[in-house]
Amino acid sequence: MAREYSLLNTRNIGIMAHIDAGKTTTTERILFHTGKIHKIGETHEGASQMDWMAQEQERGITITSAATTAFWKNTRFNIIDTPGHVDFTVEVERSLRVLDGAVAVLDGQSGVEPQTETVWRQATNYKVPRIVFVNKMDKTGADFIYSVKTIGDRLGAKAAPIQLPIGAEENFTGIIDLVEMKAYEFDGKPEENYKEIEIPTNLLEQAKELRAHLVEVAVEYDEELLMKFLDGGEISISELKSAIRKGVINADFFPVLAGSAFKNKGVKLLLDAVVDYLPSPLDIPSIKGILPTGEEVERHADDTEPFSALAFKVMTDPFVGKLTFFRVYSGILTKGSYVLNSTKQQKERVGRILQMHANNRTEIEEVYSGDIATAVGLKNTTTGDTLCDEKGEIILESMVFPEPVIQLALEPKTKADQEKMSIALSKLAEEDPTFRTYTDDETGQTIIAGMGELHLDIIVDRMKREFNVATNVGAPQVSYRETIKLPGKAEGKYIKQSGGRGSYGHVVIEFEPNKDKGFEWVDKITGGRVSKEYINSARVGLENALRNGVIAGYPMIDVKATIVDGSMHEVDSNEMAYKIAASMALKEASKKMNPVVLEPIMNVEVTVPDEYYGDVMGNISSKRGIIEGSEQRGNAQTIKSKVPLTEMFGYATELRSFTQGRGNYTMIFSHYAEAPKAIADEIIKKSGK
């Protein structure tokens, strides 16, 4: 099957925004105009095409990046809809990783909002070219020029309008195209027809000034044009478009458009801008990867190169099973073929290849370089894995996901729920690399851990809706740890005689702190005093005991254990006895080793307008935080600090209240550190150990 659309006519784009900026509605309109939807779904009615999970429709927010393919003016779009809530930044991260460009949607009344800053920073990290769509121009208080200004002030980004709205609020009727100096009036119907009109006289001067500024900014990206401009030459429309495109592809310049997706105004012109200014897979740098020899190589968007792709999302579909979304960087993949998962060194068979539209799908025979598709049949592939040709093995740069920072206990309501719950949790953990689940050895409770309270709410909700599992949910908890500060040596001897065959296990173990190196086991038994089998049992027993700690019931980390002596009984020795003996040795030695409670310390980055800088610094210090520095970004300050997680519960609400919603923060696990005595005593008391 031949390639239907050339690489030049392919756009892999994301739609990114603050929650409630109208991103999903904008995506809806794009899908409507590109022929994928016959009836438009309104987000505020809970009927959107992209928001296909039940909770998304109920809450009116986008949680999962739904990938969809659409077509516009001989160009094929692969669109990824990204969530706008801070608990789902991992979804944004993984979609940005595989995109070539993005449309940033702003609210015409608010301009750049806190979550816009978070998502914008992530896009900047991945050097994603962007165009900006100022949406909701029909809204009361909408102000296009103010919104453009916030891009420079709050994001420190170089932006300039390429359109000027005609009117605002209920009088928003059309736009002036500043590149071609033409004006268009919208009819406001779903088909979004528009007609060319004269540029209104009251806006002509402003339009000329904005165009002159646009030309000045754009020619900087083309040396020949800059010389022509400085010599007083006239810059043609095609030259201006080409210069704007260069600035956009450099991820250095961000053209701004205006519209109202809800009122069917400006979305078709936005689609034209995606084609004109956002990059094709050929415009972006080739991807780097590592060969089995360790040598770094590049793979290009070329069908003749060996196949290489990155899995960026895994989902469970109730009808098809496991779906793996992947971006092809080089080569071609045919359905039914075998690929190598080079990250896990496992061979996988691609059963079917699907092209997705929200939650509908079309089966295709082949997928080409530069494209995004979904595979059915990959059993062991997870998010961030590289898929490649067996003969052209390569590992592409993967995605790094933050550790979960919040956990809570789940209990199934009935016996039937118990069985379904473990299946549901393993499937959900497979989909989401920032979600973990395990069983607490002491209480037997199932613990789930994730990125925030909303994140875990959604997980519990999905279990109920998709897997029909009813649960009782505990309060959120911090994941503490324990460690030792001094070395210690102890004997563990377990002898049990109860008529007939007894039990005998005897070990001597030396313990010492092993900072930042995890658990280490060393065998120094000589002369066969304890057999290898029982030494291994002692190790297993010790690891089990460490999982439950010695002072507060939390896992003990960073311990080196050396087994130095022991003995065996020719009849009564058994594996269980050595497991118990090792745990007895730990308990005994802990009396000398000064065990302590460790608490998780988070890297917290808070970005706030300058006027709130002092308040935030004081607030962080009051939370036992250590300020590591700050940097100016536009008219905002980003404060970097390390803060104990215990102090961060409810921080989103706190920050919102004293910055009027203009502050935002990111929080990622840094390390474990010893908890102050008063806090440790409280934790130990609560544990009842």
Swiss-Prot record:
BP-aspect Gene Ontology terms: ribosome disassembly
Subcellular location: Cytoplasm
Keywords of this entry: Cytoplasm, Elongation factor, GTP-binding, Nucleotide-binding, Protein biosynthesis
Protein name: Elongation factor G
Family to which the UniProt record says this protein belongs: Belongs to the TRAFAC class translation factor GTPase superfamily. Classic translation factor GTPase family. EF-G/EF-2 subfamily.
PROSITE patterns: G_TR_1, G_TR_2
NCBIfam families attached to this UniProt entry: EF-G, PRK12740.1-5, small_GTP
Family matches, as InterPro entries: EF-G-like_DII, EFG_II, EFG_III, EFG_III/V, EFG_IV, EFG_V, EFG_V-like, G_TR_CS
CDD domains: EF-G, EFG_III, EFG_mtEFG1_IV, EFG_mtEFG_C, EFG_mtEFG_II
tr-type G domain boundaries: 8-282
PANTHER family xrefs: RIBOSOME-RELEASING FACTOR 2, MITOCHONDRIAL (PTHR43261:SF1), TRANSLATION ELONGATION FACTOR G-RELATED (PTHR43261)
HAMAP family xref list: EF_G_EF_2_B (MF_00054_B)
Cellular component GO terms held in the UniProt record: cytoplasm
GO MF annotation list: GTP binding; GTPase activity; translation elongation factor activity
Entry superkingdom: Bacteria
Function of the molecule: Catalyzes the GTP-dependent ribosomal translocation step during translation elongation. During this step, the ribosome changes from the pre-translocational (PRE) to the post-translocational (POST) state as the newly formed A-site-bound peptidyl-tRNA and P-site-bound deacylated tRNA move to the P and E sites, respectively. Catalyzes the coordinated movement of the two tRNA molecules, the mRNA and conformational changes in the ribosome.
Keyword set includes tRNA processing: no
Annotated GTP binding sites: 17-24, 81-85, 135-138
